[in-house]
């Protein structure tokens, strides 16, 4: 797998990549499975390869059941800790991140960074109830890097609006009726944001999202806000999505020389769309002002310096030339950030647009999904590329012998080829919806759609899969928590807005 990664320039993963393993710690042996992890080759260089590890049974290690180990430099050594400690001041969810000494098959690898994965244990460690954790599917984004000319990404697949929604811990979710309902709710909300049906503040928790964006700007982390690095927790109490911090890589942060390192959010399309929301922008601004006050008291910078000193001493035992971060830059950074008004931010954000996309050997050109729980279904096609496409045919295929058993019969007649307009780069996707009724013995078949770029002979085959629909209407009344509390005078909200407390 590692050799394959060096051939194509990135590491691709599959569930079948896991191999059995045993973890020994303090005279205990724990059964596990593990695989290589990471996207870029920096995770595979030298002897300190990155691994994703899942412990079996009820076993945990450092309170975690799923985690990764990697060379500390892939996360900027202790920079991740400085980032997380800052976010904790704003009650933004963070994974555990520690340093451990690792032996692999008897070979001393030295110090490795251990990073918690996205499970209910992460939520419980952040004093949150178990809930759904979502992300955008990034598989086509990485496939486009393999297929792209000169190993470059294809701009067509760097669009969060066309990506499918993915979920962590999928088996456990579908086995739980409560979690399944939460999944439908959370996915419907996030799809509503993707398609601009709902405002960002209706989908995301304004306070935690605004604070997250402010801290990312404060630390200069552009990496944590890339759409494919975003992770969202569906809070079943507030029924909103909250960001989970991940992979800040502040060692690669933009500096503030001539202001070029500021407003990293506005170089990410999704963050421009989120910051346009007045409620989230208000919380973003409030968090920046809080950071300024924290810095003016000097205790916060001293706190970060004490953390840095502790970890530089530890890491310096192996990495002798490791330097600290320029924490004195932070006061200058926060002052410059506060100089920008909301109008300035929106104006600057409009300047960042993707480059051109030429016709290439795309990894895919459409997404096709099936929604609906009854006998009547909706087959939806989404154009992923900035070129018009034709759907040549839709067929019912026998699952056992892959032969066509009967023609696809929509509720309204179709005339092939079906036309699907181009999707503008970073724009809302071009779609086509077809209603149809399930045929007799529908469990014995699968749908197969064949499509092509107009003027191109290459045929792309696509098997539609079941998906959760976008909410057509708001799933709950848009009321502020203060308005709701007026209906229940015996309750009050905790200062951190995370608990309801009975008044005495």
Language-model regions, residue ranges each:
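Phosphate/dinucleotide-binding and metal-coordinating scaffold of catalytic cores
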Residues: 1-504
């Amino acid at each position: 797998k590692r050799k394959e990664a060096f051939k194509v320039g990135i590491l691709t993963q599959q569930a079948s990549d896991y191999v059995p393993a045993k973890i020994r710690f303090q005279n205990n042996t724990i059964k596990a499975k593990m695989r290589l992890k990471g996207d870029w080759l920096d995770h595979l260089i030298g002897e300190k390869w990155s691994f994703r590890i899942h412990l079996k049974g009820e076993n945990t290690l450092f309170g975690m059941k799923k985690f990764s180990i990697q060379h500390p430099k892939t996360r900027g050594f202790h920079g991740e800790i400085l980032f997380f400690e800052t976010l904790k001041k704003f009650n933004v969810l963070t994974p555990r991140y520690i340093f451990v000494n690792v032996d692999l098959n008897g070979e001393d690898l030295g110090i490795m960074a251990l990073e918690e994965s996205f499970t209910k244990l992460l939520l419980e460690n952040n004093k949150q109830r178990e809930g759904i954790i979502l992300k955008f599917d990034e598989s086509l984004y990485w496939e486009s890097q393999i297929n792209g000319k000169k190993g470059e990404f294809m701009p067509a697949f760097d669009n969060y609006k066309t990506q499918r929604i993915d979920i962590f811990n999928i088996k456990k979710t579908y086995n739980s009726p409560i979690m399944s309902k939460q999944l439908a709710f959370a996915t419907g909300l996030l799809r509503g944001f993707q398609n601009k049906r709902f405002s960002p503040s209706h989908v995301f928790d304004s306070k935690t999202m605004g604070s997250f964006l402010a801290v990312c700007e404060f630390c200069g982390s552009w990496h944590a806000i890339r759409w494919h690095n975003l992770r969202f927790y569906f809070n079943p109490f507030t029924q909103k999505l909250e960001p989970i911090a991940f992979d800040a890589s502040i060692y690669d942060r933009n500096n503030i020389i001539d202001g070029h390192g500021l407003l990293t959010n506005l170089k990410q399309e999704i963050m421009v769309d989120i910051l346009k929301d007045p409620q989230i922008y208000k919380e973003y601004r409030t968090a920046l002002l809080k950071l300024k006050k924290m810095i003016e008291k000097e205790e916060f910078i001293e706190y970060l310096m004490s953390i840095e000193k502790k970890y530089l001493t530890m890491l310096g035992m192996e990495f002798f030339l490791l330097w600290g971060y320029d924490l004195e830059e932070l006061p200058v950074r926060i002052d410059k950030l506060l100089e920008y008004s909301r109008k300035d931010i929106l104006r600057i954000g409009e300047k960042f647009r993707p480059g051109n996309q030429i016709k290439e050997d795309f990894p895919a050109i459409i997404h096709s999904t099936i929604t609906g729980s009854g006998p009547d279904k909706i087959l939806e096609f989404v154009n992923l590329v900035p070129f018009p496409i034709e759907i040549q045919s839709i067929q019912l295929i026998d699952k056992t012998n892959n032969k066509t058993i009967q023609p696809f019969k929509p509720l309204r007649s179709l005339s092939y080829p079906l036309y699907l307009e181009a999707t503008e780069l970073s724009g809302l996707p071009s779609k086509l919806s077809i209603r149809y009724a399930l045929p007799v013995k529908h469990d014995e078949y699968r749908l197969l759609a064949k499509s092509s770029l107009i003027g191109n002979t290459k045929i792309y085959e696509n098997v539609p899969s079941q998906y959760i629909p976008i909410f057509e209407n708001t799933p709950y009344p848009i009321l502020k928590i203060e308005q709701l509390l007026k209906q229940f005078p015996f309750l009050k909200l905790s200062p951190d807005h995370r608990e309801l407390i009975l008044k005495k």
